Design a protein with these regions (language model features):
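Alpha/beta-hydrolase fold nucleophile elbow
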Residues: 182-195
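C-terminal catalytic histidine-bearing segment of alpha/beta-hydrolase fold enzymes
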Residues: 283-325
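N-terminal targeting or regulatory segments adjacent to alpha/beta-hydrolase or S9 domains
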Residues: 1-52, 105, 133, 325
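Cap/lid segment of the alpha/beta-hydrolase catalytic domain
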Residues: 100-101, 107-169, 227-229
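Hydrolase active-site cap/lid region
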Residues: 198-246, 305
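Acidic catalytic loop of the alpha/beta-hydrolase fold
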Residues: 271-276, 303-304
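Short beta-strand/loop motif that positions the catalytic acidic residue
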Residues: 261, 267-269, 273
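N-terminal cap/lid segment of alpha/beta-hydrolase-fold proteins
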Residues: 33-77
Length: 325
């Protein structure tokens, strides 16, 4: 049986099985070009606080659906460093009290609502944020693996049909809309999330490029996705069908996005997490080319809140906020 030390040594150099397809940059450039909403209907939320402004705004997703985001920011400051907080699978947008931890540091925080799961899978996935859904089951649904082998579909069509595609597109749309809010310091926009939110935070940081000042992700989903699916789905034999399936998954894989992240990065990996496998988290981290990056590894934690990592987040925010705090 492999010990923790040897396992960690293995993870330090693991880059994953899922490869980034050649059409990745072109595919996502097209998605971003057609997906540039502005915030609309900015209104006061039904919460009162003497020192903080609580607001909500809506924006249009690429499929025309109207989505909502929450805003919490300190009053009386013209421009603010801003964090976009993406929530985990099965979880509602975080409450105002949770968002206040960022405002207490002098940050504005924008928390987009994740669109609801279909009723058919809602019961199964509603506790995914607690680590009660396996990485294999999450991958099977969000990549729509049952339909990826349709012979008539191209790689791009396969990827666009997956539920994960729309969530990544939504996350970028929220970030684009956030950039044009009048209080946002465009030079200090960061992303953060856990699980599904961690994947969206990394993906969005990659798509924003130089417009993202930092990204924080704890146990992100959907990295090295090919290793998460059931045996036999992507066989070792290189047939046109298997290549197409692998490329479609690669277009949505968190590790593929990681290769495009150049901003300061802070990540956490829990070695007992079965929803976000440590191999995937480390594959994503090891592919990030950013010069300033750090991974915190927690051998005895699973898919759960980690107080130590929250302390690291505070230090990260203070370090990369441009000296405003």
């Amino acid at each position: 049986m492999r010990g923790v030390s040897s396992y960690r040594d293995f993870l330090k150099t693991y880059h994953g099985r899922t490869l980034c397809p050649d059409v990745f940059d072109e595919f996502w450039a097209d998605v971003c070009e057609e997906n540039k909403p502005k915030a609309r209907e900015v209104r006061k939320a039904s919460v009162n606080c003497s020192r903080l402004t609580c607001e909500e705004f809506t924006y249009l997703a690429s499929d025309g659906v109207s989505l909502k985001a929450h805003i919490l920011r300190p009053r009386g400051v013209a421009l603010l460093p801003t964090v976009i907080l993406y929530t985990d699978c099965g979880r509602e947008v975080r409450g105002w009290l949770h968002l206040a931890r960022f405002a207490s540091l002098g940050f504005a925080v924008v928390a987009p609502e994740i669109r609801s799961l279909p009723q058919a899978v809602r019961t199964s996935f509603e506790k995914a944020w607690k680590g009660e859904v396996s990485a294999g089951n999450l991958t099977a649904y969000y990549f729509n693996t049952n339909a990826l082998d349709r012979a008539e579909d191209s790689v791009v069509e396969c990827a666009r049909r997956a539920p994960l595609f729309q969530l990544i597109s939504d996350a970028y749309a929220a970030a684009h809309a956030t950039q044009f809010l009048p209080f946002v310091d465009k030079g200090c926009l960061m992303t953060w999330g856990e699980g599904l939110g961690g994947a969206l935070a990394l993906d969005t940081a990659a798509l924003l490029g130089l417009q993202c000042a930092g990204v924080m992700a704890q146990n992100p989903f959907f990295a090295d996705s090919e290793a998460c699916v059931t045996d036999g789905f992507c066989s070792a034999q290189e047939t046109p069908k298997n290549v197409r399936i692998a490329d479609a998954m690669g277009l949505l894989d968190t590790a593929s996005f990681a290769e495009r992240i150049t901003c300061p990065t802070l990540m956490a990996c829990s070695l007992e997490d079965r929803s976000s496998l440590p191999e995937g988290t480390c594959a994503a981290y090891n592919r990030i080319p950013a010069e300033q990056k750090r991974m915190a590894v927690y051998p005895r934690h699973a898919h759960e809140r980690i107080n130590d990592f929250e302390n690291l987040q505070i230090n990260f925010l203070l370090t990369y906020s441009g000296g405003r705090l």
